[in-house]
């Protein structure tokens, strides 16, 4: 017997979700001669679930989902003895941007920034989050710390390549971000990882912004 949830596509292009129970049908001789399926439409419930873990402005994952999924990612990586990379970032001088360009323009920056992060991810095991305000994070896995740093630098470049003018940014004429990167074997990660990444982020800010500080 197989039980699970399936995402399907309607002819009109809309998606719908079903919960399915599939079990084999046997002949008198005990051979499988077919399958029977029971399906329940759970689209409304799935939409509510998705809304509860999605940031309303940017449509990327929110802080609630970060708090839920991050420990699971770490525990899964521990079983496989893998590295986990946590890239914590903050848009440089965002308050100055809001004060001078207006909150509507500020919201547009937040949306473009989030879209850039999401489009920079390559694998289903990589996650982008808006943690609140102008704070974002990416959780991803790389084979080596060097590759993790390389990917973080790609993210930083992609953000500046958006070419969103920010006359009040001391680091660049455009929107940029300061970042703190923690890349460790999952078995060496403890509950201080968020604070450690936050400390690195603010070290990046103190050092001139638009840069990445990495754990030793």
PLM feature spans:
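A short pre-motif secondary-structure segment
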Residues: 127-130
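Short regulatory alpha-helical coupling segments
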Residues: 50, 63-83, 114-122, 141
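PAS-family sensory domains
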Residues: 7-16, 26-27, 30-41
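Sensory-domain boundary capping and coupling elements
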Residues: 20-22, 39
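Catalytic-core segments of nucleotide cyclases and related cyclic-nucleotide turnover enzymes
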Residues: 28, 103, 145-153, 169, ...
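Active-site-proximal alpha-helical element of nucleotidyl cyclase-like catalytic domains
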Residues: 105-125, 135, 154
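Conserved nucleotide-binding and Mg2+-coordinating catalytic segments in signaling enzymes
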Residues: 49-68, 89-103, 111
């Amino acid at each position: 017997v197989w039980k699970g949830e399936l995402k399907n596509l309607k002819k009109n292009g809309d998606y719908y979700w079903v919960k399915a129970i599939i079990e084999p049908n046997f002949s008198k001789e005990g051979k499988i001669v077919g399958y029977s399926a029971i399906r329940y439409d759970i689209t409304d419930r799935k939409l509510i679930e998705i809304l509860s873990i999605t940031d309303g402005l940017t449509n990327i994952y929110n802080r609630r989902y970060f708090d839920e999924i991050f420990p699971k990612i770490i525990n899964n990586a521990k079983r496989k003895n893998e590295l986990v990379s946590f890239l914590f970032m903050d848009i440089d001088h965002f308050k100055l941007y809001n004060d001078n360009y207006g909150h509507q323009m500020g919201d547009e920056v937040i949306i473009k920034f989030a879209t850039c992060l999401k489009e920079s991810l390559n694998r289903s095991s990589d996650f982008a989050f808006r943690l609140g305000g102008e704070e974002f994070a990416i959780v991803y896995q790389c084979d080596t710390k060097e590759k993790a740093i390389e990917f973080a630098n790609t993210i930083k470049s992609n953000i500046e390549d958006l070419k969103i003018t920010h006359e009040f940014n001391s680091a660049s004429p455009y929107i940029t971000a300061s970042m703190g990167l923690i890349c460790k074997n999952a078995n060496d990660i403890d509950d201080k990882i968020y604070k450690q990444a936050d400390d690195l982020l603010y070290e990046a800010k103190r050092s001139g912004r638009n840069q990445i500080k990495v754990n030793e």
